[in-house]
């Protein structure tokens, strides 16, 4: 029975799923906008939003937790120096998920995932 099982399996083993979600979160935090399938985007929200919440309180313990979850020093620096202060006044809801049509090859529903408060210069350039 499937009672109280929170996460989507996404047809992957647990280690593959964890690695994929970590890579998606790192890409999102690095580029601030990515395109992926809709189920992956919805699951990514559960991984990326707590990371941004960690970045709002710059302590050594939070930096170590963020590094444990991302395994990327550049992302941790950006998270605490840039994204944490940017979202300091927002209580959750850091991501925007927009439906982006269907993929050409297999007709999978696609989604555009972006950070809500992106700088205007970057948003206009892309």
From Swiss-Prot:
Q: Which GO terms describe its molecular function?
A: structural constituent of ribosome
Q: Which UniProt keywords apply?
A: Ribonucleoprotein, Ribosomal protein
Which terms does the UniProt entry file under GO BP?
translation
Organism, by scientific name, is: Laribacter hongkongensis (strain HLHK9)
Q: What is this protein called?
A: Large ribosomal subunit protein bL17
Taxonomy, superkingdom = Bacteria
Q: Please report which protein family the annotation says this sequence is part of.
A: Belongs to the bacterial ribosomal protein bL17 family.
InterPro entries hit by this protein: Ribosomal_bL17, Ribosomal_bL17_CS, Ribosomal_bL17_sf
SUPFAM superfamilies hit by this protein = Prokaryotic ribosomal protein L17 (SSF64263)
Question: Can you state the subunit structure given in the record?
Answer: Part of the 50S ribosomal subunit. Contacts protein L32.
NCBIfam families in the record:
L17
Give Gene Ontology CC terms.
Answer: cytosolic large ribosomal subunit
Q: Does the keyword Secreted apply?
A: no
Q: Which Pfam families match?
A: Ribosomal_L17
